[in-house]
Amino acid sequence: MLPLSPSYDAIVVGSGPGGASTARELALRGLRVLVLEQGGAEPLQGTVTQMAAMAAVPGKGAYVHRDASLLVAGITAGGSSAINFATAAPPPKAMFERHGIDLAPALAALRAELPMAPLPDTLIGPMAARMMAAAQAMGLDWRKLDKMIRPAACRSGCWRCVYGCPFGTKWT
């Protein structure tokens, strides 16, 4: 239970990757941090029904962009990382270098701490395998993307990542 008159040095809104990372950095510096999350913290079940309840609510988790594309935000603990495919991509190096910012040490520290690596071949789904074969047949450079998962806990053939992994495989 929270104290009656809580005192915090920082309040972070959202527990997705951005909010969680910000809260972590502030806490590591000794600050008292409160994280506010609009969604719940129910255990992920990996079902379409649960995913729809936390991400497909118009005006809350689902938005139609002016180009008619659907933007989906996870309204749950872990934010959108709970309902997406755990793809990890580094920020554009050149953009930061133009401002004199070297991200290499921070990226190396993240890689050492987080489960970030290309998806093992045994976990490549049939559609991704078909895309890879087609790209390679055309002479294109197709590479597996880094994922933030724990491969040992992943179930081959499950493909429930987008619904919210019920096995705790994804780093969310």
Spans of features found by a protein language model:
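N-terminal glycine-rich phosphate/pyrophosphate-binding loop and immediately adjacent elements
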Residues: 1-99
